[in-house]
Amino acid sequence: MSPNNSKLVLSSKSPRRVELLKKIFPQFEVAPSYIEEVLDIGLRPEDNARNIARAKAESIAPDFPDCWIIGADTLVTLDNEIFQKPEDEKDAERILNRLQGREHHVITGVCVVGPEKTIDKPITSKVKIKPLTEKEIKDYIATGEPMDKAGAYAIQQKGSFMVRSFSGSKTNIIGLPLDELKILLKKTRYPFSA
């Protein structure tokens, strides 16, 4: 299945999402949304991820009529606590100390706003982080890699050393579940060509 020349827009400033989307669509436009990503503590993490993804896509939709706009937001959860991107190095250290030696959930809310229909869905994967020493945590933070990642690590980069195992979609853990995205695009009548 390959896309035709229909307009596809990614509402994200994440280089990882751009990289992932290029694996299935060689051509698309990137138009980041600059909405404030605010969590509603009264909602489940899955609903927060969906709502933020939808807000990202819908915020730019008026600028792209007759297009399919993709929004996504990734959260990490453990024991009912939600971890987004760390605010600073101290916060990254706190997050990694909480995750180390434990299994957590990575939830990506994905939304597709099509010309006729909007669909969103949360996708969940599980990741088990091995026990980490204080030095391993500090050395990893010193690389700068954790600073723009939900959960303060990147499974596909240097942070892979700390991952003992995972289940579910790896592209979901990175930030954009590709198989599930294709299903949402089909449901919004994205015109794939054979």
Regions found by a protein language model. Give the residues of each.
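Anionic-ligand binding patches
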Residues: S2-V9, R44-A194
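N-terminal beta1-alpha1 ligand-phosphate binding loop
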Residues: P3-P26
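Cofactor-binding loop segments of dinucleotide-utilizing enzymes, especially the Rossmann-like FAD-
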Residues: K13, S33, P115
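Surface-exposed, flexible loop/turn segments at secondary-structure boundaries
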Residues: R16, E36-V38, T118
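Generic domain-boundary/flexible-linker signal
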Residues: E19, L39-I41, K121
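A short beta-strand-loop structural module common to alpha/beta enzyme folds
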Residues: F28-L39
